[in-house]
């Protein structure tokens, strides 16, 4: 699901580096 995927990325982003993968994934998925 997109919601679960986004949530997982958000958690990983919070624990990991800045919002770099989130933007990339958002561009490809959203």
UniProtKB/Swiss-Prot annotation:
It catalyses: a 1,2-diacyl-sn-glycero-3-phosphocholine + H2O = a 1-acyl-sn-glycero-3-phosphocholine + a fatty acid + H(+). Its main location: secreted. This is Phospholipase A2 acanmyotoxin-3. The keyword Lipid metabolism applies. Expressed by the venom gland. Keywords: Calcium, Hydrolase, Lipid degradation, Lipid metabolism, Metal-binding, Myotoxin, Secreted, Toxin. SUPFAM superfamilies: Phospholipase A2, PLA2 (SSF48619). Its cofactor is Ca(2+).
